[in-house]
């Protein structure tokens, strides 16, 4: 079993309303159930971070899921996600890794309905991530991250 802790710095900027930022702490567990299947669970924003002048609470989310790897370069992902403020969200996705340095991602979710596409590029110990999220009511979101592994 693997245990991990991550710090995330989030910045929100809305035109004509200003910007705000916050530090969030996440905790995760992962266990290999077999050569093909792994299980994971995570709590995001375990520190209850808030944002803005109104101190709006940021999402606190519990997730549990399975990853199935039918081939070395392909993962199928199934996840139950529960934000403490909203209904249970079922998510499904896949990760295709055609090269050791490149991962391509796609996924769908049902609460609310949305889909996402993304990629990761690994250069030595650095990881560069980009994701595009299409929400039927809120429109398009672009996300980027840089990580050290």
Predicted segments with their positions:
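Outer-membrane beta-barrel porins/channels
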Residues: 1-149
